[in-house]
Amino acid sequence: MDIPVEFLTAQEPLSYGHIPPVYWKELLNWIDRILTHNQATPNTWEATHMVLLKLHGTLSFSNPAQLPLVAAACLQIAAKHTEAHSRLADPDYITMLGDGVYTKPSLLLTETMALFIVGGHVGAYTLAACDWLLGSLPFSQAENDLLHPYMYHYIKLSYRHRTPDYHSSPALRAAVVIAAAVKGADLLEMNMLFIMMYHLTHISTASLSLGLTHFTAALQRQINLDFAEAEQREAAERRALLEREREQQLQEARERLDDVMAVLEAEVAITITTATEGTDAEDTSEVDVINVVDPIG
């Protein structure tokens, strides 16, 4: 059961964002025959892994024109044979993927990168594939902001130090695994991804451990930065809140003081008026008494 010859003899380059419908239809028919023949279960990883094994050694990974085709096929398989992803509609374009279609893009990204790793292509093809994948998967802007720096950092760093023989360079393979897992999976999910990739690519334990160490350190630095920024925001919000509360308390104190002053002024005015009236009455009495006493004197 061979792949259609059209895929191996294609002369025109296939862009990273669009795959001609004729290629899609032929490839999906071929994949359907494989999956039907092997009675695949509707499980994302099992279905994709099965086709990975079938594709291994069949496609020419030295041909950059086939990279997006293979990557798109892997994503299409994962969507096609998983019930939760049945909303994927038009198979002619991979770029029509929308928010909410994939519930675990990190897993799909890992599976697709596994295809490139198994194929053994290197260097610029890997980076081009990452560019294409990042442009195709439905990541939010916030997720892209997190994913881009780590992916390019690890892949380019490992590519710079690669050995001539790709298969003797586990660092590059580990880098792609790390980049694929950086999507933001929790620790349990991330460990599962690494375990699957370990069995698929035979990354050495030392390389995997080193990769996890670097990944954890980088992630911790990012977490620390995010935490520091969050603390600064919270401190600024607390200062603003305290300032507002202080102003409110001062305003309430001023209002209470004004009320007290008004009461005091009223009481003082009453006291002064009463005192003045009392003094006038006493003066008149004294004059009367004097007038009475004077004749006797």
From Swiss-Prot:
<feature type="domain" description="Cyclin N-terminal">
    <location>
        <begin position="21"/>
        <end position="113"/>
    </location>
</feature>
<comment type="subunit">
    <text>Interacts (via transcription activation domain) with host TAF9 in vitro. Interacts with host CDK3 and CDK8.</text>
</comment>
<dbReference type="InterPro" id="IPR036915">
    <property type="entry name" value="Cyclin-like_sf"/>
</dbReference>
<protein>
    <recommendedName>
        <fullName>Retroviral cyclin</fullName>
    </recommendedName>
</protein>
<comment type="function">
    <text>Transforming protein which induces the development of dermal sarcomas. Induces positive and negative regulation of transcription from host and viral promoters by interacting with various cellular factors involved in protein transcription regulation.</text>
</comment>
<keyword id="KW-0553">Oncogene</keyword>
<keyword id="KW-1120">Modulation of host cell cycle by viral cyclin-like protein</keyword>
<keyword id="KW-0010">Activator</keyword>
<keyword id="KW-1121">Modulation of host cell cycle by virus</keyword>
<dbReference type="InterPro" id="IPR012167">
    <property type="entry name" value="Cyclin_epsilonretrovir"/>
</dbReference>
<dbReference type="GO" id="GO:0042025">
    <property type="term" value="C:host cell nucleus"/>
</dbReference>
<comment type="similarity">
    <text>Belongs to the cyclin family.</text>
</comment>
<keyword id="KW-1048">Host nucleus</keyword>
<dbReference type="GO" id="GO:0044071">
    <property type="term" value="P:symbiont-mediated perturbation of host cell cycle progression"/>
</dbReference>
<keyword id="KW-0678">Repressor</keyword>
<keyword id="KW-0175">Coiled coil</keyword>
<feature type="region of interest" description="Transcription activation domain">
    <location>
        <begin position="21"/>
        <end position="113"/>
    </location>
</feature>
<keyword id="KW-0195">Cyclin</keyword>
<keyword id="KW-0945">Host-virus interaction</keyword>
<feature type="coiled-coil region">
    <location>
        <begin position="222"/>
        <end position="270"/>
    </location>
</feature>
